[in-house]
Curated annotation (Swiss-Prot):
Residues 1-32 form a transit peptide. Coiled coil: none annotated. It is found in: Mitochondrion. GO terms for biological process: mitochondrial translation; translation. This is Large ribosomal subunit protein mL55. InterPro entries: Ribosomal_mL55 (IPR018615), Ribosomal_mL55_sf (IPR044884). The gene is Mrpl55. The keyword Ribosomal protein applies. Its main location: mitochondrion. Belongs to the mitochondrion-specific ribosomal protein mL55 family. Component of the mitochondrial ribosome large subunit (39S) which comprises a 16S rRNA and about 50 distinct proteins. It comes from Mus musculus (Mouse). Keywords: Mitochondrion, Phosphoprotein, Ribonucleoprotein, Ribosomal protein, Transit peptide. The keyword Ribonucleoprotein applies. GO terms for cellular component: mitochondrial inner membrane; mitochondrial large ribosomal subunit; mitochondrion.
Amino acid sequence: MPLAILLSLLRHCGVRAALPTPRHLHTSPWRADCSRASLTRLRRQAYARLYPVLLVKQDGSTIHIRYREPRRMLAMPLDLDALSPEERRARFRKREAQLQQKREEEPEVVDSFDTERYKQFWTKTKK
């Protein structure tokens, strides 16, 4: 009788050692896979500082993304190499006109700062 118990224990341990141990790391059906993770809401605190933003692509299509700054809309930059030469020149002229307006609007700073009055503070004194 003890021999039968000993053999059954050896057989049981041998079968257990031969089979891989079940690990429930990313194998359970209720865990999120790549399809489910992209369709569900974010449940992590690590994404708490990301804000929903509407991303506008170059072709005009829009996508809702999460961005680190709270903005309503974020436009992708336009590829100037893809434009025709006429469109490129028109954009350049429009941009130059805006820059000239900004230069003209710069107010002249009236300064009444007297350097001689404060010269004593930046000259080194001998000790």
